[in-house]
């Protein structure tokens, strides 16, 4: 029996990291990432989907950006931290990291570069709005408790139908928004 309660002020929660379920096979990575981004950046019928779709592209790029750097934690919290620009403007941070990895002989995948380029080549006003949309949905990972609760796995969701496994979600209504 597991209780996933990422906002528990005592830290009494099991951990669940959605990024750990992304396939290592490049052929399936984007669809796995898209499944996660669809849950985070859901759009209401009839709403302007443009900003949400662009934020999903940013999510795709940053997810690959994090996953392709073994020295970084492969977590949603790390994606949010990378989106801050790490003390630099975000465009500069991403471009400088891409260039540095290229020089080290450890270039990012073309899928990662393509996703990032679609976002960082936008005009500044558009880019700023996309980053704001991304941050508005990802800011929950700035919370130390949520970041910790999504940093690793204490159970494997793939075992749900194979083993006797019960997972409770302990999230109060005011945190569901």
Where does each model-flagged region fall?
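P-loop NTPase motor domains
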Residues: 1-177
């Amino acid at each position: 029996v597991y209780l996933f309660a990422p906002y528990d002020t005592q830290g009494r929660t099991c951990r669940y990291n959605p990024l750990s379920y992304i396939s290592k096979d490049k052929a399936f990575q984007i669809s796995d990432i898209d499944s996660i981004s669809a849950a985070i950046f859901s759009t209401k019928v009839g709403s302007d989907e443009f900003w949400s779709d662009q934020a999903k592209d940013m999510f795709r790029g940053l997810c690959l950006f994090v996953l392709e750097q073994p020295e970084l934690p492969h977590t949603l919290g790390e994606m949010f931290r990378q989106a801050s620009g790490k003390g630099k403007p975000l465009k500069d941070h991403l471009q400088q990291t891409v260039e540095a990895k290229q020089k080290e002989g450890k270039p990012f995948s073309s899928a990662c570069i393509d996703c990032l380029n679609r976002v960082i080549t936008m005009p500044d006003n558009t880019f700023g709005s996309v980053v704001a949309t991304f941050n508005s949905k990802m800011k929950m990972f700035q919370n130390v408790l949520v970041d910790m609760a999504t940093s690793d796995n204490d159970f494997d969701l793939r075992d749900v139908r194979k083993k006797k496994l019960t997972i409770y979600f302990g999230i109060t209504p005011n945190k569901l928004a």
